[in-house]
């Protein structure tokens, strides 16, 4: 806590403040906390090594090191440094690619007693030369493949190449080099006003203080995974590194290729289960919180964030807005989003531990709450000063008038205290700006431009584009015309890419004030079309048209031609990433580095690659939101929900090899992630969890029945036992049994319906045949590439459920619910007992010839689909059987509709089924032709084949959900499953004729747990087997006599055959409104139009 003398000093300096304000300022700066002030960074790291040596410390791509391994390698390299003269406060330049080796190097420098100077490998040669010269680094640590970057650099120190073979022969124990927390740890160069960057000297104690902040305020633990995003030259990289390595967490290095692709970045975060990440707001704005599942804490820093960005993320993560200049060890204040953020800005928060904030006037007098002033910082994190810049150090690091004997850093930032103890950032007092999170002194950019032989005057200003992102504009005077490309090239030789102006404007002379200085207020605004000095050339092909469309959108400029320069029009690296991201939606791929090399469309087009989006091939793990059909399942609260399976039995006369089967199913369950689901109860909800590859992935049993004369009964009983053994909470949900018999082997597979459906079985049969064949021939099992995961489908479906496009469907379902009555069908008996054990079956089938007509000849008459015909027949049958003109049934669909752009689930295993109410309107049953067309049109009017009905019910956010009563309660369920036997018959196996116990098999026989409930009064399932259409009617024997259902079955067959015959006999194709995309047009109106056309032609 601040002591009383400090409080008195605050009172003395705040001459105009009230007593309440003095107390307020005292309270907000009361941040004193204990921290390991006498320990260095590497000592704190070594403490973590001793506590958790085998924990993963650092990960990069497929390489990782434990804390022990990282410590050993750093010790080995540190010994080399010591041998070569590195010691206390000596500087070592580090110019390495992002890699584990880079962080070994940093730790090694600290352990040797030195301080490191990070140098970005993408810096221009002149900037690298200046940093090495200015810092007088004794050594430069680099990598062999980067040596070419320093070929033309004059460096008097030692160049050390990081080589594993040289390092590993050294001793790996801790060194115990004498060191103090006030020793220099690193020097970071930032933009300077003199035309050259300046080095800021940071000591160990600032990071030692942050260690406790990470643990106590950010709640970072050894279980966290920290994303390493920032460039080594940016002090956020120090923050990320030691947030992990001083707390026992794991550091995950994210490479540039991933960062440059927003989609790839989101996938990486989810795959690696990153929990804490620090990002510039300019990057976060392009990410989607619905697609990033693992992040628990999101920290934005480097530039101002916006209320809309905070509100977008705050419900999904702990959102922290952090502020802090490099001169105060990275972070000085933080603000945590706890409620809806309104207004025009987001606070930068309150001081972190052992940090004091003072907002003062030019005389260092404290400003009152609400008054703007310069933000000054004191405390443990203050830098030692600027390297070899004593005058600048004394200007910026002044004696602290509030705490004798300490220093105060004058940030040059303008801010004010808010009544709630937070600080509002108001901008800069001087000409310093932030571009994409990097500090930029406008004077440095100006001084570089003035080096150009033809530029006599220049003024650089900052502006905001149509996306509210800052950019630089350089206005210059020159007697000669200077091409824009030449200016960009000249700038890039000395300035990092973020400091290169997006626009250049040439003037004959500068506007001046009465004092003869440049009048910045009179400088022209950049014209967003300025720079298009070439004649307009239109795009010549589809790809060029696509690029023009994207550039115009990203840059906010109209009429871009193929010769226009991306960067001359205001493009930058973030906008380049946006271009690449948007090309994804056109299935095109662009490397952002190519846009840097080829900045015009006519050049760039040759480097655009066709990229049919490749789905993520990694292992899917973690919590997954329930899909609508899964919500429906748990809502029913079936008596035994564990036993609600689908199963299949295969037969192979020559027998199966057990060892091959084990390899095959291991691969299948690894490949098809949904098969590893389990379901837990948590806080009154069901949570769906995709397990990884640990534990038992499936249960496999072998039965030798070769000497058993009663094999069929044993197979049925054992299958039934396995069916009943599935447990949703513990898994696995896949049960396999191999039955050896005298006449071959029977392979039984039971999978809980929550993770499999009819299409899934087709995929599994195909993969089983492929993998078994490969394994039999001693080949590596290689299944077709994964399509998008069930997890991704769930995420995207929830987003779609709340999209404007989807909400337009509400009108259809609203009308259906309000203008349709629930009609109950007749029953022979009244009962409340709807148990599965009372379910019985009646079936009908068509001949092979009749089925062939249905599949191949019928649809031509009215351009129908098979469901149009099957449901028309059902409508006629129900009218005849129950004397009902109009009834609502429940229709099941496969649910894999193409509603999500770029989502490919063609080979994804899971339960995707959709179900929705459909009206069978038979009021004109005397006109067969009309009824077929009416059924077709009614089905075509259903948006996206009905998938939206239960999306509205279960996924749409309550406040967006339309007022739908969901009161329709169909008693009849209809599901056409398609053709199954062709998917099972292969050269390896066929379908077994034996019973599988109680299951919901793909053939539609609905024998689940005997004590489970049957949801519908009648379940009607259609499927094709051995060339014949089969229709089964399942019913409760305590509600119906068998003869009653037989009547319905006979009526259905009779009407179906009549429809088949009618359509086959019809010579001409009769079109309906939906064939012309006129779904709202009634059939009668369509007939009137055709009549008028006929009259006009005669």
From Swiss-Prot:
It catalyses: L-phenylalanine + ATP + H2O = D-phenylalanine + AMP + diphosphate + H(+). Residues 538-612 form the Carrier domain. GO terms for biological process: antibiotic biosynthetic process; lipid biosynthetic process. The modification O-(pantetheine 4'-phosphoryl)serine is found at residue 573. One of its GO terms (molecular function) is phenylalanine racemase (ATP-hydrolyzing) activity. Pathway: Antibiotic biosynthesis; gramicidin S biosynthesis. Belongs to the ATP-dependent AMP-binding enzyme family. In the first step of peptide synthesis this enzyme activates phenylalanine and racemizes it to the D-isomer. One-module-bearing peptide synthase with a C-terminal epimerization domain. Each module incorporates one amino acid into the peptide product and can be further subdivided into domains responsible for substrate adenylation, thiolation, condensation (not for the initiation module), and epimerization (optional), and N methylation (optional). PANTHER family: ENZYME, PUTATIVE (JCVI)-RELATED, PTHR45398. NCBIfam families: AA-adenyl-dom, NRPS-para261. The racemization reaction takes place in the thioester-bound stage of phenylalanine that is formed via the thiol group of the serine-bound phosphopantetheine. This is Gramicidin S synthase 1. The lineage of its organism: Bacteria, Bacillati, Bacillota, Bacilli, Bacillales. The gene is grsA.
């Amino acid at each position: 806590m601040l002591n009383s003398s400090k409080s008195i000093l605050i009172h003395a300096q705040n001459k105009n403040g009230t007593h309440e304000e003095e107390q307020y300022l005292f309270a907000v700066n009361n941040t004193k906390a204990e921290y390991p002030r006498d320990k260095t960074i590497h000592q704190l790291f070594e403490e973590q090594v001793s506590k958790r040596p085998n924990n993963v410390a650092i990960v990069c791509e497929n390489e990782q090191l434990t804390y022990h391994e990282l410590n050993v390698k750093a010790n080995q390299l540190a010994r080399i440094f010591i041998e070569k003269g590195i010691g206390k406060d000596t500087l070592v330049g580090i110019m390495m690619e992002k890699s584990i080796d880079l962080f070994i190097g940093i730790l090694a420098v600290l352990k040797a007693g030195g301080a490191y100077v990070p140098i970005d490998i993408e810096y221009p040669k002149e900037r690298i030369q200046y940093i090495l010269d200015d810092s007088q680094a004794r050594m430069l640590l680099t990598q062999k493949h980067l040596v070419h970057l320093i070929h033309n650099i004059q460096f008097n120190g030692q160049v050390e190449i990081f080589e594993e073979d040289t390092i590993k022969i050294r001793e790996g124990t801790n060194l115990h080099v004498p060191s103090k927390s006030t020793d220099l740890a690193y020097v970071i160069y930032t933009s300077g006003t003199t035309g050259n960057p300046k080095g800021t000297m940071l000591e160990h104690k600032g990071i030692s203080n942050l260690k406790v902040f990470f643990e106590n305020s950010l709640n970072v633990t050894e279980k966290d995974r920290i994303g390493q995003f920032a460039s080594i030259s940016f002090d956020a990289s120090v923050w990320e590194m030691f947030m992990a390595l001083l707390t026992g967490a794991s550091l995950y290095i994210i490479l540039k290729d991933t960062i440059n692709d927003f989609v790839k970045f989101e996938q990486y975060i989810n795959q690696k289960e990153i929990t804490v990440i620090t990002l510039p707001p300019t990057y976060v704005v392009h990410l989607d919180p619905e697609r990033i599942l693992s992040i628990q804490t999101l920290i934005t820093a480097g530039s101002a964030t916006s209320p809309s960005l905070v509100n977008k993320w705050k419900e999904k993560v702990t959102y922290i807005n952090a502020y802090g200049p490099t001169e105060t060890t990275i972070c000085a204040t933080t603000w945590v989003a706890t409620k809806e953020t309104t207004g025009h800005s987001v606070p930068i928060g309150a001081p972190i531990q052992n940090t004091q904030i003072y907002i003062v006037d030019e005389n260092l007098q404290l400003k009152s709450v609400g008054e703007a002033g310069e933000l000054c910082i004191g405390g443990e994190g203050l830098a030692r000063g600027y390297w070899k810049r004593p005058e600048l150090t004394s200007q910026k690091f002044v004696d602290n008038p509030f705490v004798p004997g300490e220093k105060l850093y004058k940030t040059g930032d303008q801010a004010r205290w808010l009544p709630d103890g937070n600080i509002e950032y108001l901008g800069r007092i001087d000409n310093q700006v932030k571009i994409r999170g990097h500090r930029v002194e406008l004077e440095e950019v100006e001084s570089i431009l003035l080096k150009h032989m033809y530029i006599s005057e220049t003024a650089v200003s900052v502006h905001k584009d149509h996306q509210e992102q800052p950019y630089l504009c350089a206005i210059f005077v020159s007697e000669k015309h200077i091409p824009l490309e030449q200016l960009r090239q000249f700038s890039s030789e000395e300035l990092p890419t973020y400091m290169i102006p997006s626009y250049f404007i040439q003037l004959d002379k500068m506007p001046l004030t009465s004092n003869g200085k440049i009048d910045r207020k009179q400088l022209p605004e950049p014209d967003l079309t300025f720079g298009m000095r070439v004649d307009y050339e239109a795009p010549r092909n589809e790809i060029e048209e696509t690029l023009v469309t994207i550039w115009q959108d990203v840059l906010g400029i109209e009429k871009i031609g193929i010769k226009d320069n991306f960067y001359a029009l205001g493009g930058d690296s973030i906008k380049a990433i946006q271009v690449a991201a948007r090309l994804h939606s056109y299935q095109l791929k662009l490397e952002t580095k190519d846009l840097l090399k080829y900045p015009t469309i006519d050049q760039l087009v040759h480097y655009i690659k066709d990229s049919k989006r490749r789905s993520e091939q990694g292992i899917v793990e973690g919590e997954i939101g329930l899909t609508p059909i899964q919500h429906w399942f748990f809502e029913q609260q079936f008596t035994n929900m564990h036993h609600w399976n689908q199963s299949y039995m295969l037969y192979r006369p020559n027998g199966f090899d057990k060892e091959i089967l084990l390899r095959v199913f291991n691969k299948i369950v690894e490949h098809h992630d949904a098969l590893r689901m389990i379901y837990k109860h948590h806080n009154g909800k069901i949570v769906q969890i995709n397990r990884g590859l640990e534990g038992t992935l499936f249960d496999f049993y072998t039965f030798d029945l070769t000497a058993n004369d009663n094999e069929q009964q044993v197979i049925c009983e054992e299958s039934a036992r396995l069916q009943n053994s599935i447990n949703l909470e513990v898994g696995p949900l896949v049960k396999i049994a191999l039955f050896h018999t005298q006449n071959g082997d029977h392979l039984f597979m039971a999978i809980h319906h929550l993770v499999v459906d009819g299409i899934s079985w087709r995929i599994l049969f195909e993969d089983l045949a492929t993998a078994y064949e490969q394994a039999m021939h001693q080949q590596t099992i290689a299944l077709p590439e994964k399509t998008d995961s069930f997890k991704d489908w769930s995420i995207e479906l929830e987003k779609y459920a709340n999209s404007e496009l989807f909400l337009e469907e509400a009108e259809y379902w609203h009308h259906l619910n309000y203008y349709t009555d629930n009609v109950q069908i007749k029953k022979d008996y009244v009962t409340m007992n709807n148990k599965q054990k009372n379910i019985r079956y009646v079936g009908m089938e068509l001949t092979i010839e009749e089925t062939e007509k249905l599949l191949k000849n019928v649809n031509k008459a009215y351009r129908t689909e098979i469901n149009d015909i099957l449901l028309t027949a059902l409508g006629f049958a129900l009218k005849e059987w129950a004397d009902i003109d109009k009834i609502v049934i429940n229709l099941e669909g496969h649910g894999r509709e193409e509603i999500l752009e770029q989502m490919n689930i063609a080979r994804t295993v899971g339960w995707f089924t959709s179900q929705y109410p459909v009206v069978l309107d038979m009021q004109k049953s005397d006109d067969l032709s009309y009824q077929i067309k009416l059924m077709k049109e009614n089905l075509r009017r259903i948006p996206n084949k009905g998938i939206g009905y239960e999306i509205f019910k279960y996924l749409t956010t309550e406040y967006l959900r339309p007022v739908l009563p969901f009161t329709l309660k169909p008693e009849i369920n209809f599901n056409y499953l398609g053709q199954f036997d062709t998917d099972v018959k292969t050269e390896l196996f066929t379908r077994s004729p034996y019973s599988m116990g109680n299951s919901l098999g793909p053939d539609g026989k609905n024998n689940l747990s005997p004590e489970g409930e049957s949801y519908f009064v009648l379940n009607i399932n259609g499927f094709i087997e051995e060339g014949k259409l089969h229709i089964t009617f399942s019913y409760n024997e305590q509600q119906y006599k068998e003869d009653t259902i037989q009547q319905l079955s006979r009526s259905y067959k009779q009407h179906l055959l009549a429809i088949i015959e009618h359509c086959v006999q019809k010579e001409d194709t009769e079109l309906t409104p939906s064939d012309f995309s006129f779904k709202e047009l009634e059939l009668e109106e369509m007939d009137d139009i055709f009549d008028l056309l006929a009259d006009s032609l005669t």
